[in-house]
Amino acid sequence: RLFMNENDEVTKDISEGLKYIKNTKEINNVLLTGGDPMILSTSKLEPIIKQLREIEHVRIIRIGTKVPAFNPFRILNDPSLLEMFRKYSTNEKKIYVMAHFNHPRELTPQAIEGLNALMDAGVSLVNQTPMVKGVNDDPDVLAELFSKLSFIGVPPYYVFLCRPTLGNETYSIPIEKGYEIFEKARIRCSGLAKRARLVMSHESGKIEVVGMTEDQIFFKYARAANEEDNARFLAFYRNPDAAWFDDYKEAIEEFSLFTKNETNVVTS
C-alpha cells in the first residue's frame, strides 16, 4: 500500500518494497493499492509500473482503482495513460485493473467507454465491490451489477463483507444476511455473471463464505497467512448477529489439505 497516510501498511518510499520483490522470486503477482493509484498522474505512476515490469518473475501487475467508476475521463482524456498500458501490459505479462463498481448505475456510457479503452490498450479487467448497506445489499441490484459487468467483459471477482469499524459500521452487513443476499443475486444471473466469490479480508487471510444450512455456516480460506490454513474448511454454528469472522468463536469441524511442513499431506 503506497498512497495513504497514517497507516502501518503504507509507505511513501517504495524502494525497499521493490528491492524485496526483486529478491523474492516466489512473487509473481503485485497489487498496487492505497488510496487509489490511478489518481496519480501518469508521470508518477509509470515509473512504478516500469520498475515492476523490469523484474522478470513479476508476471502480473494489478491496480486497484475506483477511477473507472467515478472519473472515467481520467482514462479517456489522457492518451499517455493508455500508451503506458500498451507498453507494459504485454501478451505474456498482463496488467490487471481491479475496478470497483458498486452499483449498476455507475456503469454509465462514459464508464463503459473508459473500460473499453483500457481493454483496447491490453489491460485485463475484473470487478470487486464491498457489500454496502443501502447501496447494493439487494439481490436484484447485485444481480444487475453482476450481469451488466459480464455483458461488457468485466468479470465479477470478489464481493467483500465489510468489517464493522469506526466510520463504516453503519454500512456493514451481517455475514449470514450478506450470504443470503449474495446467493439470491447469483441465481438471477447466467453462468459468466456468477463468478464472484463472497469473502472477508481477515488478518489471517482471505476467507470465503461457501455455504449455510439451517444450523451451520461454512467458510474456506481462499488465501492464508499461515501455510497450514491454505484451503482450510471450517464449520460453525450459525450466529445471525455475526458481523465478522471473529464473531464465530469455536469451529465445530474443520479440515485442511495441508500441514505446515507437508503440503501434500491431508490432515483434519
Model-predicted regions and their roles:
Residues 1-5, 36, 169:
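Short coil/turn segments at secondary-structure junctions
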Residues 1-11, 63:
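Canonical Radical SAM [4Fe-4S] cluster-binding loop centered on the CxxxCxxC motif
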Residues 8, 13, 36, 78, ...:
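Acidic-enriched, low-complexity/disordered segments with a strong bias for Aspartate over Glutamate
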Residues 14-23, 27-29, 38-189:
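Conserved AdoMet/S-adenosylmethionine-binding subsite of the radical SAM
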Residues 34-35, 66, 203:
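Fold-independent oxyanion-binding glycine-rich loops
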Residues 147-268:
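Auxiliary Fe-S-binding modules of radical SAM enzymes
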